[in-house]
Structures are given as structure tokens and as C-alpha cells.
């Protein structure tokens, strides 16, 4: 309806079977003023595209529902892959894998590294395509020039959400901004959601999930406070403070460059 209004249309017509209850509910849920005309077994529906308070309310409600649903794979994944997992205990890829595997994550965790058979006793896989199952969430910690091809692999194998730890994007200048624009274009074309790039991850302390997809050195107590931070240094300090003060958190998101998932998206998710 919004696209039609932008092109100068003021009304829409549709024809459906009169007993197609599901389709009639779709029309009604639009919130647009509607007239129905039944003839024989068909029903003609005429929708006015003039916005009303009710149609605006319905549109905003649908947006909130869609945003919440799109972010769920970030916080409630059944399976997670760390792409760029490393054997070096000091590396971000190793710390991410260790955080996921050592904090009681209730899903399945996979390490992706084409040059290692095992990492910290965990079997590794050369690529997403070699995994025994699709994953919901991919945590990406590869060099910046490899990120775009990794996103292509994610889309091709059914990944639904990304956390891009890798830096070197809009925060470093014009070339980085251009690379980030290409990254965002790929993400949106494939219908994915992405936290980052240039972030340190996300966590969910829900006892049924216990997701720690960060390289922070702490996993906070479970609680009812949700937090996000653009600054990595501030985010790490907040997590350390929550541990020191014994303040429980529900979820934490390091949004980084906020190329896709924004604080506004998170507020809608947390509200719902």
C-alpha cells in the first residue's frame, strides 16, 4: 500500500473467493478502509489507500511484530557457527568459541576453520556447507576482505542472523564505508539480520539459552535488565561492572557500527 501511494495510486482492488477467510483476514488486518462486494462465489474488495489512524496503528504494529521475529534467531538460536575459529588462545576466534562452549549454551556449537582438525578438543569443519545441519546464527571473525564471501555462504546455507565481529569498515574511512555498504546490501538482499560489524558480540542469559557469543571475559548473572553499547570499551566495562556489583542482565548487544540492527530495533524487541 505504501509503495502504491508513492506512485500516485489512491485505491486498490482485489478479487478472492468469498469463502477464503484467511485472505479476507489479511485485507482486514491492513487497517485500510475497505468495501466488500460479493457476487456469485467471488468477493471484490476495494481498499482506500488514504491513511487513517487505524491503518497507521496497524502498520506500526506489523513492523514491531516483524522486527521482533527477525531478531529472534540472534537471541534464541538452536545452532551457532563461529566462522574464523582459531587455535591461538589469544585470538578473538578462539575466545568466541570458548565463550560459547564453556558457558552452558543449550544449542549446538560449530567451529569453522579450513586449516584445523580440532580446536580446544572440538571438531572443526572447513565451511558452513560441510556442517551436519543448518545453523541459525553465524558469528563471523575473519579478515575484512573475506567477510562478503562468508555472508554469501551464510545465505546459501540457511543462516538467518549474523554477528560480524570483524573491524575495518565504516569506522576507518571512505574505503571502509564502501565495503560496509556492500556488506549491508548483501545482508538485506538475502533477508538476514546483522549485528555489527566492528562489535564484540551478543549474549542472552536466559537459563534455557545461555548464549555467550562475545569475547568478553565474563558472563553476567541472569536478570531482567537488557543493555546495548556502541562503544566496545564501554560495553566491556559495563559487563565487568555488572559482574562486580552482582547485577543480573537478560541480554546484552554490542552494536558496533549498527549497519543493520540498530538500538531502535533492539528497543522494539525488548518491548515485545
Model regions and ranges:
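Conserved GNAT acetyl-CoA-binding A-motif
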Residues: 3-16
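Catalytic-core regions of core metabolic enzymes
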Residues: 50-272
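Conserved catalytic-core motifs of GNAT/GCN5-like acyltransferases
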Residues: 15, 31-47
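Conserved, charge-rich beta-strand/loop surface module that forms ligand/interface-binding patches
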Residues: 15-21, 60
